Structure formats: structure tokens, C-alpha cells
């Protein structure tokens, strides 16, 4: 896996005439507690999302014919079912925008790792196209659209580290320490359904205020159940624990260790067994996507072709 991080210099270098490359950052769950199971089967939780300065890239070039062209195609997945394509079409439908786009995804994050790759891709499509098409929807409206695509998409749309409650829909923005992380992807994929159906999964962890949670040891209620089902995750986590405090993110499969500085994280990364893909990144409380949008706005870099007179808020 490519090992580089988003940076201000890297983001600013993505300006390429009428084509831009927008970051789709990874996220980790610094903690995750399951507080109850509702009558409809959904689980209520308390979790803390933080972005990483590492992720996929989505290249966008505006079209005037209204077509949405997405490359490359993913085997066994029609483009019409891809979250990026669906995000673009939903934005067109919501605003009446007559512009289109060529979209190209440079996939770097591991698929099925629990670091939010698909949700981040969809959010980047919404936020970036809203900027480029000049459709001028608010972040809250974009988040409502994003919720149709996935429960985690609104977090990426808002672009701020957040404490989530309920089934993930209640967000409180916050600023946890921006530590360095080594993230590993074991050679397995997790079935979320298996984890949440397991009778050993904690479902009654006491709800606590954010201030208390931020000052206590971070844990993940899904971790023990995942380790019981997936020995590959248990092995990867055990390796990380030799170097630093480590946990599962979400329901996995990715695990991460936290370090006080980049040097310590990179040193551990160099010892990584070859069978693991992984990367070193720093936590960031402002999404690199929003950092780039802010940079473009300051530079008055306008890539909308004709003004989109058919848009509406």
C-alpha cells in the first residue's frame, strides 16, 4: 500500500487546470460503546470519529453535457450502484444541476477495513461537486443526502471530528488529541452481521457524558467478539500491542496503534510483517477535504464552467 500522508503542500499541488484531485480521508473510531439495542434491531452507541491525513483521491473534471462518468469500474459492481456515482446523481436531482463530471478514483485505502473508505468517497463526491458545480447547498443539506448513502457519510460531509450517539445520527463536534497512528489491515474481511448477532456482544454499556469519555481509557465493545471470530485480527492486534496501545476501529478489520510522534509510528511500520498492508497517518480534527475546499476558496480557484443557473438550495 502506498505510504504517504495528505499535507497542505500536497493538497495545493492537486490543481491541474480544469481537473482537481480531492482527498477522501480515512477515519478511525477512537472508542466505540454499544449502549442498547432498539426494538427495530438497531444498536445505539457512543463513538468518537477522527479523520486521518491519509486516504483515497477522487479526480474530478466538469462536463457540460450532464453525464456522470466514473472510472475505473469495480468488478461485480455496476457504476450505477457505486456510492460515488449515486452521490453525484442525487446532487443533480436535488439541485436540478445540468452539469456533469468525469470522476476517477485512485483507491488507496483497504476495502472492508472499517476506515470509512466508501463513505468518504461518497462524501467527497457530494462536497466537491457542490463546490465545483456551484450548487451552494449547505453542509446540513448535503449530510441529509449523504445519509441516504450510508450512516457514516454525514460525518465525512461535515468534516469535523465528532462524537456520535444514537445509531450514529446525533453528532457533537469535538477536538480530541491529534496523535500519530499505525493502521494495519489483516488478511480478512469482517461480517458486521455476524458481530452484531453474536450473543456475547456487549449491549448495555452505560451511557456517559463526552467529557468523562475523553478522560477515560478508550475501548471498543466490538473488539473481543471480533477477535473471537477472526484469528487474523487477533494476531495483527497482538503484533501492534508490542509497540503501543492498540485497538480495533469500528467492527474492523483494521486495527491501529497510537503513538506520540511520527518517528515512533514509522519505526514500528518498518518492522511490519509483509503480510499486512498498512500506513502511518496523523489524526486530524478537520478533514483534509475541507482543508482543500478552504484552500481553493482562498485562491478563488473556480472550476465551474458556465454558471449553473438551474441549481437551487
UniProtKB/Swiss-Prot annotation:
Its EC number is 2.7.1.148. It comes from the Bacteria. Pathway: Isoprenoid biosynthesis; isopentenyl diphosphate biosynthesis via DXP pathway; isopentenyl diphosphate from 1-deoxy-D-xylulose 5-phosphate: step 3/6. Transmembrane segments: none annotated. ATP binds at residues 110-120. InterPro entries: GHMP_kinase_C_dom, GHMP_kinase_C_sf, GHMP_kinase_N_dom, IspE, Ribosomal_Su5_D2-typ_SF, Ribsml_uS5_D2-typ_fold_subgr. It catalyses: 4-CDP-2-C-methyl-D-erythritol + ATP = 4-CDP-2-C-methyl-D-erythritol 2-phosphate + ADP + H(+). The keyword Transferase applies. This is 4-diphosphocytidyl-2-C-methyl-D-erythritol kinase. It comes from Histophilus somni (strain 2336) (Haemophilus somnus).
Amino acid at each position: 500500500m502506498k505510504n504517504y500522508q495528505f499535507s497542505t503542500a500536497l493538497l495545493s499541488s492537486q490543481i491541474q487546470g480544469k481537473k482537481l484531485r480531492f482527498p477522501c480521508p480515512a477515519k478511525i473510531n477512537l472508542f466505540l460503546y454499544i449502549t442498547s439495542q432498539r426494538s427495530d434491531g438497531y444498536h445505539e452507541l457512543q463513538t468518537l470519529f477522527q479523520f486521518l491525513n491519509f486516504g483515497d483521491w477522487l479526480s474530478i473534471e466538469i462536463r457540460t453535457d450532464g453525464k456522470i462518468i466514473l472510472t475505473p469500474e469495480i468488478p461485480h459492481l455496476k457504476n450505477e450502484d457505486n456510492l460515488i456515482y449515486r452521490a453525484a446523481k442525487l446532487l443533480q436531482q436535488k439541485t436540478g444541476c445540468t452539469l456533469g463530471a468525469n470522476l476517477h478514483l485512485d483507491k488507496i485505502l483497504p476495502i472492508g477495513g472499517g476506515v470509512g473508505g466508501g463513505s468518504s468517497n461518497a462524501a467527497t463526491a457530494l462536497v466537491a461537486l457542490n463546490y465545483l458545480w456551484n450548487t451552494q447547498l449547505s453542509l446540513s443539506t448535503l449530510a441529509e443526502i449523504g445519509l441516504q448513502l450510508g450512516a457514516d457519510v454525514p460525518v465525512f460531509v461535515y468534516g469535523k471530528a465528532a462524537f456520535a450517539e444514537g445509531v450514529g445520527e446525533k453528532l457533537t463536534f469535538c477536538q480530541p488529541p491529534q496523535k500519530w497512528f499505525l493502521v494495519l489491515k489483516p488478511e480478512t474481511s469482517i461480517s458486521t452481521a455476524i458481530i452484531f448477532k453474536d450473543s456475547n456482544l456487549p449491549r448495555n454499556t452505560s451511557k456517559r457524558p463526552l467529557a468523562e469519555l475523553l478522560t477515560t481509557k478508550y475501548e471498543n465493545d466490538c473488539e473481543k467478539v471480533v477477535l473471537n471470530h477472526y484469528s487474523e485480527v487477533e494476531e495483527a492486534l497482538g503484533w501492534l500491542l508490542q509497540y503501543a496501545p492498540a485497538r480495533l476501529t469500528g467492527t474492523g478489520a483494521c486495527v491501529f496503534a497510537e503513538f506520540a510522534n511520527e518517528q515512533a509510528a514509522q519505526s514500528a511500520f518498518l518492522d511490519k510483517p509483509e503480510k499486512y498492508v498498512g500506513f502511518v497517518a496523523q489524526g486530524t480534527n478537520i478533514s483534509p477535504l475541507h482543508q482543500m475546499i478552504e484552500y481553493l476558496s482562498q485562491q478563488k480557484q473556480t472550476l465551474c464552467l458556465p454558471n449553473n443557473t438551474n441549481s437551487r438550495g
